[in-house]
């Protein structure tokens, strides 16, 4: 029986020249020669490059089917692997049979016809866009990065924890959350005071989609020592920018008995590990991005993995920015949250390497970050990368109950709403640290694709929840 193989296996030499093989996939192009030959390029998504199938006009269905094949038709091709005289490919298939599995019913209206489409147009046909070179390459890189993240944490002795998507707490204290409710919007139950009676809702109280798995993750870190979460998170932020999604994935490790320095080391090790993985495993896709999207993709990643991370205190970073003589759009002064232009100046022009900025003013950071001895700053950190700015945000968590309570009250939160989170500090508290990595932001950095909506299969953003 003829072996069925992926196109990746054939092109990478897993199937020997002279061996008979069957590949299954979709037609990218067909061209016919006057000499009675047809050349099909067939892809199956297993790698960037398609395979070329040479078809003689003496096969049974040549006139009836092969000459009618158009982009998008699905086929099963059986033939012998032969060395290719053509440039850019080592082997091709000398075809014996072509079975047409599915036709494109009307080639003239097929949205993925064989021409280059704008990335904006592809968002309108998100169900078909993985058939294109660019989105297919993004999907493979996304998979590679996800697998590398899981592998890294497993090798480091971390446990993966599934944190809930439905929650009653706001991790960031930002309030931009999607409500989860089964109440009849046409007939909302009311309390005597006239407010919505959430006691009659599914959970008996207000519930939301999570903005972060961090608080839940901390509970497991304070029992299993090293954990990470990796899952979807949601922000009801009305931002129509190239950097924002309403639904995105987050990687959030938490480590017990860890300081901010341990946290920064973990972030550096993880990023270098996953970038090395993608440079090794998805070179073909990165070469495509380098050629057609961002010429610096490969050199940027190689520079990143070979650069020691710089470290600087926020206060010193402000000093560097003030003394730079550069005119920034957003003025620089102590107490501001660094904007993208500030972050990129530090990483790209000042340090020319990834940099960890740490010890931020407490007023611009979340309640759970550990208050430093100066009483003005917290043990927070951001990892800034050349080419994008902030890629990771994290902190040492506040392990002292009295300080945590005070911070909550300062920020207008009710400590009683976080009773279970406070329990971690009451029963065997430990210093612990963690960070958050926006997964799609990581993919943007690796691929050079500029819009975050193009690195997630079905983007969710204001007024857009199609498919």
Curated annotation (Swiss-Prot):
How would you classify this enzyme at the top EC level?
Answer: ligase
Q: Which PANTHER family match?
A: ASPARAGINE--TRNA LIGASE, MITOCHONDRIAL-RELATED, ASPARTYL/LYSYL-TRNA SYNTHETASE
Molecular function as annotated in GO: asparagine-tRNA ligase activity; ATP binding; nucleic acid binding
Q: Which family does it belong to?
A: Belongs to the class-II aminoacyl-tRNA synthetase family.
Where is the protein found, in the record's own terms?
Cytoplasm
Q: What is this protein called?
A: Asparagine--tRNA ligase
User: Which PROSITE patterns does the entry mention?
Assistant: AA_TRNA_LIGASE_II
Q: Does the keyword Ligase apply?
A: yes
Reaction(s) catalysed by this chain's protein: tRNA(Asn) + L-asparagine + ATP = L-asparaginyl-tRNA(Asn) + AMP + diphosphate + H(+)
One biological process term in Gene Ontology? asparaginyl-tRNA aminoacylation
* Subunit record text: Homodimer.
Identify the EC number(s). Answer: 6.1.1.22
Report if keyword Protein biosynthesis is assigned.
Answer: yes
């Amino acid at each position: 029986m003829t072996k069925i193989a992926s196109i990746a296996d054939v092109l990478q030499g897993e199937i020997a020249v002279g061996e008979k093989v069957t590949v299954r996939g979709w037609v990218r192009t067909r061209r016919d020669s006057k000499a009675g030959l047809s050349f099909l390029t067939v892809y199956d998504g297993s790698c960037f490059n398609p395979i070329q199938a040479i078809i003689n006009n003496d096969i049974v269905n040549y006139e009836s089917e092969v000459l009618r094949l158009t982009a998008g038709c699905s086929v099963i091709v059986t033939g012998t692997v032969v060395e290719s005289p053509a440039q850019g490919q080592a082997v091709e298939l000398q075809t014996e049979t072509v079975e047409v599995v599915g036709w494109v019913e009307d080639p003239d209206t097929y949205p993925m016809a064989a021409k280059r489409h704008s990335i904006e147009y592809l968002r309108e046909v998100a169900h078909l866009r993985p058939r294109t070179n660019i989105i297919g390459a993004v999907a493979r890189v996304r998979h590679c990065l996800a697998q590398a993240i899981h592998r890294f944490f497993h090798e480091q002795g971390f446990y993966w924890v599934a944190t809930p998507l439905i929650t009653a707490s706001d991790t960031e204290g930002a309030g931009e959350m999607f409500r989860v409710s089964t109440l009849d919007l046409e007939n909302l139950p009311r309390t005597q005071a006239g407010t919505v009676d959430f006691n009659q809702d599914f959970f008996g109280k207000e519930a939301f989609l999570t903005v972060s798995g961090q608080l839940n993750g901390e509970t497991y870190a304070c029992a299993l020592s090293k954990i990470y979460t990796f899952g979807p998170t949601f922000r009801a932020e009305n931002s129509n920018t190239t950097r924002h999604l309403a639904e995105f994935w987050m990687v959030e490790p938490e480590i017990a008995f860890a300081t901010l320095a341990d946290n920064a080391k973990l972030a550096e090790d993880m990023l270098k590990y996953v970038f090395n993985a993608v440079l090794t495993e998805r070179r073909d896709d990165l070469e495509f991005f380098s050629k057609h999207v961002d010429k610096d993709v490969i050199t940027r990643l190689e520079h990143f993995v070979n650069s020691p991370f710089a470290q600087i205190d926020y206060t010193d970073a402000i000093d560097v920015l003030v003394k730079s003589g550069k005119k920034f759009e957003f003025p620089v002064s102590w107490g501001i949250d660094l904007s993208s232009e500030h972050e990129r100046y530090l990483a790209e022009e000042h340090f020319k390497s990834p940099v960890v900025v740490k010890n931020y003013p407490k007023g611009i950071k979340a309640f759970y970050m550990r208050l430093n001895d100066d009483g003005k700053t917290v043990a927070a950190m951001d990892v800034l990368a050349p080419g994008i700015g902030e890629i990771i945000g994290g902190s040492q968590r506040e392990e002292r109950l009295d300080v945590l309570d005070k911070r909550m009250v300062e920020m207008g939160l009710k400590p009683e709403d976080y009773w279970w989170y406070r329990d971690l500090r009451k029963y065997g508290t430990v210093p612990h640290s963690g960070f958050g990595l926006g997964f799609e932001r990581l993919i943007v950095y690796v691929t050079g694709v500029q819009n975050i909506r193009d690195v997630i299969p079905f983007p969710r953003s204001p007024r857009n929840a199609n498919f």
